[in-house]
Amino acid sequence: AQDVIANGGTPEIGDLATPTNSSPFTRTFINALPIYRRGLSSNRRGLEIGMAHGFLLYGPLSILGPLRNTETAGSAGLLATVGLVVILTVCLSLYGNAGSGPSAAESTVTTPNPPQELFTKEGWSEFTSGFILGGLGGAFFAFYLASTPYVQPLVKIAAGVWSVH
């Protein structure tokens, strides 16, 4: 019988090759994410990740926020999203400037070639700059989409699902 779990490199860091993390599907999916995709600059990585965060945070913060059944729910959701993106950017900046900067990425079973240029102080600073720009852009784009007449009925349906009437 063949072992299902194999040693994937250094067992001290818990790098085991399981059928889940070493399958071709998982490796392709993880390596297609902006943080690990080849050929992207640090700024572009931050821009893509920030856009996703800003866009996806807007919905829950506007529909589930304390002003969800008011006329200002969209604006409140936008301001909450902008505030959260700014807080996340400050945290990323603190992480990049603490000590000697971000630690170098190690290759694992799932990510055999992590981007080394991202894990320098300069690279992390570019990533953080792209993150805030993308996060704010994603939040404003989601706000714009949610306020269009085509999406507004869907927003009202979603807001009604979680309301307490």
Swiss-Prot record:
GO terms for biological process: photosynthesis. Pfam families: PsaL (PF02605). The keyword ATP-binding does not apply. Its main location: membrane. It is found in: Cellular thylakoid membrane. It comes from the Bacteria. SUPFAM superfamilies: Photosystem I reaction center subunit XI, PsaL. Keywords: Membrane, Photosynthesis, Photosystem I, Thylakoid, Transmembrane, Transmembrane helix. The chain crosses the membrane at residues 49-67, 74-96, 127-146. It is a multi-pass membrane protein. GO terms for cellular component: photosystem I reaction center; plasma membrane-derived thylakoid membrane. InterPro entries: PSI_PsaL (IPR003757), PSI_PsaL_sf (IPR036592), PSI_suXI (IPR022980). Belongs to the PsaL family. HAMAP family: PSI_PsaL. This is Photosystem I reaction center subunit XI. The gene is psaL.
